[in-house]
Every structure is written in structure tokens, then in C-alpha cells.
Amino acid sequence: MNGTQKAFFEEKERSLGVRLNDVQTQAVLQTNGPLLLLASPGSGKTTTIIMRIGYMIEALGVNPSRIKAVTFSKASAGDMKARFAKFFPHLPPVDFSTIHSLAFQVVRQTLERQGISYGIIEESDKPGVVSKKRVLREIYEQLNGSKITEDQLDELLTYITFIKNKMLPEQEWAIAEVKVPKKVEILQRYEEYKRTGSDRLLIDFDDMLLMANDIFTKNREVLAQYRRRYDYYLTDESQDTSPVQHALIAKLVAVHQNLCVVADEDQAIYSWRGAEPDYLLNFRKIYPEAQVLLMTQNYRSSATIVEPANIFIQRNKKRYNKQMFTENPAAEPISFKILENYNLQAKYIVDQLKNLSKRGSTAILYRNNTSAIPLMDAFDRAGLPFYMKDSTIRFFTHWVVEDIMNFMRLAYNTKNITIFEKVYRKMNAYITPTQMKALQNLPEDGCVFTQLLEHVELKDYQPEYIKRIRKTYDSIQFDKTTPTAMLEHIRFDFGYERTLKKMSETLGFNYENLLDIVDVLGLIARHTPTMTEFAGRLKQLENLARSSHMDNELNAITLTTLHSSKGLEFDRVYLIDLIEGILPSEVEEEIEEETRLFYVGITRAIRHLELISYSKRFKTSVVPSIFMKALKQIVSPQELPKKAPKSPKKALKQYRNERTITTESALIVGSKVKHVILGEGEILAVTSSTIELSFASGIKQFLTDTCLQQGYLETMED
């Protein structure tokens, strides 16, 4: 290290209290040529990035306007900008922006030069405004003859993003597995509408990336202009970027190759949006002169959390061989809690948190936003303040919630034909649209079921079903029947669960997810004696979710999805709903990404980490997450079960391949094997009941039956 470099680091340590480790220092000093900086959780990534940029300007004399830092989100760009201003207040600002912002600059400049009028189609979904969602809703209805649900619309939007970010040609649009009827035709019409359905060209955010890449490919003058604009590029969170984003950056740095890519393939969790972590694994093939640095020292978490997390992530094969470590001392042991039933989970968490004086650094993490609703209800009743990080929770406007409310509204007034029209298809009375239209032509002066029986032509089998439903509604007293009892009528007497099953089979919905919504409503119903109070409570919770997102008070508990938690840290972290089918999901092909998602969750914790599962979800038996079991076995390998646990076939298949050891005869003392969690090891001893293995982390003992039945061991490659 020369005098200038030494002076820079000494001054920053003195003025900022920032002292970099050897790898961080290398990353700061490596300014020319391609650099891949693989940053494990809590490794001081942002500090290193800011110090690197500051070093280039202060020590090397690089003009700040010649540096471009590209981030994953607007929030990240803002955070970087603020951090840079704090570290280097005397320096001019650097250009921190998202890749979409960079792409839009290129597109806007080109279209304006060509005199082409354009508009952005991503505006909010307001009446009278041409928006992406509104256009897609209309196209879906035209092609399918029915309205699109919010779930389907979300899937459709994700599908379009995936197609464009992957740069898939039209003949490959059908490849993506999305359960939206006529998805390809919808996308074709959507693209046509943007070109011809308005007095100007319409562009969405994904178009910006494709169009910018296309402009760079076809217009050498524009590409040369942007190449001259910046001498140094830095991309953050690059494990979350897609082929089209990589292509854009590759074109811009092709001449000077001064590219610093900051990423962690172990935290790649956005493949469903088109992200490709394989780009990181192939970085040296793309840039043969690249230097790869591993920032693996974790400054965030206790050794009690870091060491098991490091072992856990090594089960993945698509990764660099890096070992996360920490010099932090051990703290509280990781807690594993399996409750008797799902309906006890929210109360259990309230009991854990209600006596804490400082809750501001506590987070509850979950896979799906539906998991937040029982927590909101329980926290509000217990007077625990909370902050919803995710701004959009569609639970309260979900069509299943709306169905349930309409069944209840019909109980208030069985003469209401308008409400009946919304649910008649979903109560298994086999009423046809023609019969419904005939009912609508009658005056609203009698019970809809009586009107059907007396004034509408029915098939011979229909009166029996209609009379049965009428009898149930006659037994319901709106101001006395509890919402819990009403939900039982809806689910079973009206056959709503059967309806959900049929809809899932025909329209591609996830049946378990739909039932989860009904189950959550059941939890809320337990605390409301009347249907009127139940409806009021739902509205209250909806408003609470909205206001809690806007008001992040200092002592509030954070509720957030695992995806949204990336980049955050909390003193206390609780991962909930850890069961098979939720985490990991039921898609076997995505097991490595599911593993990474779990890894992201556990590495948010600083001192206290608790994993929570349950044996039953109401009356249905469920299986605790195999990830939870795996981590527990890492933490406490001596705590062997008395017999091999029963796991679903799905979980078994996730481990098995042609090298999986399934017979005791293949367990040979002295042979090298690979444990799916602990990695390479050597067999030291084998008995009929146990097997002893030596790993880099020490000697471990397992049940022989467990290893064989679960497929935990593999033979080593020759």
C-alpha cells in the first residue's frame, strides 16, 4: 500500500471510525478492470462500496460525474446517495440510480430525437387513466369472458416481466408456467395495444430495458455516446438482475471493462422475475481477466447464528465455495418451536413480545402476506405497535374475502338479488345464468330462494338443493349467529370449499392458498360475536395495515415478507409458518432458491433467532419445514429422534439423485461421502442404528435409518 492509499484509509478511520478488513481494502483499491465482489450477509457491503467510490474520487482524482452506480431499487439508490453524502460531504454527488432509470434515459433521448410521442403505461390504477393493469383486465375479459382476479393479475404481470427480462422470443412465450388462461394471447394483444391503441407509443418499465438494449445493438452512435459518458460502472445486488440488464451493462463497459459487480449468489431470490444468478457463476467466462473477491466476514450476527447458517447454505450446488464466518461472540441459541396448532401461533408470539421494553429491532418474517393478518389482529388486541413494511396487502380485497362477506350480507337480507347474483355460482345450487337472469326480472319482494322455487323454471334435481340452502339461511339469525358459525355454514353447508376446489382445478388457483384465506378469516371471527362486528373488524384491520405502513414508529415490531426483508437486520427475528408447502414450496425444481430464501431470513437476525412451526393447521395435519429440521440438526446433531421422521414424498425427492445412498451395504467405513447439509465427510463407524461421520466442522452422529430414508448421504464423484 503506497502513501496516498495509506493516508486515505487512516483519515477515514480517524474521521468516520471506519476500519476495513483486508478483503474490503482490496475491493476499494481494485478500481480498474472487472471485479466481482461476493458479499455475504452482514459483511459491510454498502460501506465498502461507498469507500471505493470515495477513494476513486479523493485519492485517484476521478471526476465524480464519470462514475455510475446502478442499484436494484429506488430505495437502495437513495440509501447509497445518503450514505455517500454522510461519508464524503465535501465531494460532489455521484450518479446513483436504478437500471430502469438508466434505460429510460436512453429510450427517452432516442424517441425525442426521432420525434416519436410516447407515454408511460405504469401509472396508478385510477379511473380514466390508461394503465397497464386496466388494459390487461380488459384484454383478459375479452379473451376469457370473465373478470380477472387480483391473484391472476399479479401472476400475469409477473409473467410479462419474466418474458421481457429473459428476452424470450414470441415463440417461447408459452414456456413460462403461469396459470392464467390464454396468457400468450393476452400478451400479444397487450403488445399490439401499446403500439396501436393510443395516439402515442406506450411503454412499461420492462419495455425500457428491452428498448434500451435494442437501441444499443442497432445504433452505434448512441452506444458510443453512453460509453463515453462514464468511465466506471458499479452494480449492486447483481444476483437479482436479469439477462437484459446484464446485456445493457455489458455493452456499456465493453471498451474499458471497468465494472465492479457486487452480489451474493446465496441471496438470489428473484428468479420468478427473470433474475439469473448463473451470471455470477459464469462471470470469469464473460470477463476472463476478472478478479473475484469473497467478503465473508459477518459483522452483523452472533456466532450462534452465523456458523449454522454457513453450513446450511452449503447444501446448494450452484454457488461459489465460500465460507461465511464471524468474530462476534456466541449469543442466545437458535430457538425451534413446534406448536400444536396454527391457531396458537399469533398468541405465542404476542406472549414472547408483550413484556419486551424495546421492540423496535424485532421482526416477524413470513413467506406470504396472508400470514401477517392474524398477527395484526393479535398485536392490535394486545396493544403492541407494529409496522407493515409491505405497502400492498390484497387480503382485504381478495375475491375469497369478498365472497365470504357476500354470503353474510345475504344472511342480513335474503331478498337482495344483487348480492345473490355475486355468489349464486359458488353455493352448489347448480343455478344457471339463464335462471339468474329470470330471477333478476322479478320484483325484490321475497326471499331469493323462494322466488327461484316458485317463479323460475328449474330442472327436476334443483329444488332439493335450493330448499336445503334456504333452510340453512332460515336458521341464521343475523344479529345472533356468530361469524364463526356462519363460516361453518359457508364452508360446508353451502359447499364453498368444494367450489374453491373446482375453481382451483379449472382456473389454476392454489387451493391451499385459498383455504388459508378462509382459515385466517376464521381466526378473526373467533374474537367477534356478530357478523356486523366481524365486518367492522376487517375494515379496521385494513385501515390499520395502511396506516402502519405509513407510520414506522421507533418501538414498532416489523412485519414483512422474507423477500422484502433482504438487506435489513434486526436484533430479534421470528420466522413463522415454517411448514412443507409454504417454505419450501411445493415446486421441487426451485429447491435451491427456496434454500436461499430461508438463508436470507435467518441471516437477518443479530442475536435472537426463533423458528416457528406447528403440527396441525386447524384440523389438518401438516409437516414442519425440512429446512427447520435441517438447521436444528446442524445446531444439535446429538438430538437424534428415536425413529426416522415421516416426511412427505415430495421432501424425499428433493434430496435424491443417482448418487444418493439408500442401502446400509453402501455405508463403508473409510469411504468419502457428501452430507446434503454438512458437505464432504468420511465414514468413521457404522452400526445397525447409528452412523458416525467426520466433517471439517467436527465429528457428527446420525441415525442410520434417517440417513437412508431421507436420502441425506451421497457417494462422492470419482
Write out the residue ranges for each language-model feature:
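ATPase/helicase motor core of nucleic-acid motors
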Residues: L102, A330-A331, L356-T481
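Accessory C-terminal helicase-associated subdomains
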Residues: H455-S564, S585, H608-I612
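Conserved RecA-like helicase ATPase core segment
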Residues: N2-K12, L16, Y55, P243-L339
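Conserved helicase NTPase motor core
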Residues: F8-F9, V18-L29, G33-P41, D95, ...
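C-terminal accessory regions
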Residues: L578-I699, T704, Y712-D718
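Helicase P-loop NTPase motor core
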Residues: P41-I49, E289-Q291, T296-P385, Y412, ...
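P-loop NTPase Walker
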Residues: M1-S117, A224, E307-N310
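Conserved helicase core region in the C-terminal RecA-like lobe
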Residues: S97-Q105, L234-E237, V262, E533-E589, ...
